[in-house]
Amino acid sequence: WEETIIYSCLQKVMGKLYAAEDSLGGKCLESAAACLGDFMFFAGKPCKELVMRKPDGYVIMVPQTEEWASVIKDCFLGTARQITRYAMRKDTVFHEERLKRMIKELPREYRLQPIDEELYDQCIAYEWSRDLVSGFESKAAYMKYGLGVVITKNGEIVSGASSYSIYRDGIEIEVDTREDERRKSLAAVCCAELI
């Protein structure tokens, strides 16, 4: 199952792995969950007990199979809703000149900046931008391992692209733009700079 969040957990870079306990209190390696940020991926033999160990708050549960999906629905009758998560093609061919041109065309009222400690705090402060950095366990962890850029306008973050998760061979990117600044290609500029 090729998912960057799972790679992050398996490689012990970030996130956590959970296994179900068997009837004797030992680990049951037939069922596992990878948990990072808002996501929890389930694999192996479907296990109700593992699903019920979800962290507090909002969680996007990703089943590997229809059997896992059924267990999740049964555990959270009336409170869970099914959505479709679209995977992006993992293409590593970029047109460098086009990316540079996009960055150069950013209007003057905007400023493109790498995420530093002050901008990290600003990302965390707003719900729309929190996921740019919140996958990391702390500010120190983001500063050490994270990679991201934001666009500011009048000192406030209006768009950003950042590593939601990292693993040895790459990153999964989180991209967000404040609602009143959307449809201006700001997210594309952030992505171009991050790449």
Predicted regions and their residues:
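Helix-loop element at the rim of GNAT/NAT acetyltransferase active sites that forms part
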Residues: 114-134
